[in-house]
Amino acid sequence: MKNTNTSNEPDLELTAAITSRLKGKLAIVGIGNIIRGDDGLGPKLIEILRNRGGLPGVSLFDCGTAPENYIFPILSTSCDTLMLVDAADIGKEPGAVEIFDLDKISRVSFSTHNPSPRLFTDLLKTGKEDMDIFVISIQPKSTGIGAPLSEEVLNSLERIADIFCAYNPS
């Protein structure tokens, strides 16, 4: 799915794609290197959500470049749904958003993290097999050291944050 909405109107396709996956207890994991421009988009989303007051009943994790260090804290939330947010070269214009299931993670080039997000999710699945894990990937514009977050990526993060802040499962 491509995020082509450049107005301030809600992106209904993106909203539906995200909210259709939200079942039970939710954890959102931001992955990325904040000193490498758009690669730090995962932690930036967590910061945006926290600055807006967090999300009731949702666990937020800024995992930086070492998500494997958060396996036990994530599992301790007993979440049913885990959403990873990371920069990835998805071959689209900067700021484009794609949602991937686990079976597609190994086919996408995720930013600068070792070990791969796939290994991380495999370890989580070992701890809780029925957890629904998916990835929201955003096409970066610049991942150079010291580069700022691009306007395109920041706009996509604000849209995603808007979706979560407006979401009401009842």
What are these regions (language model features)?
Residues 1-140, 147-158, 163-169:
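N-terminal catalytic or cofactor-binding beta/alpha core of small enzyme domains
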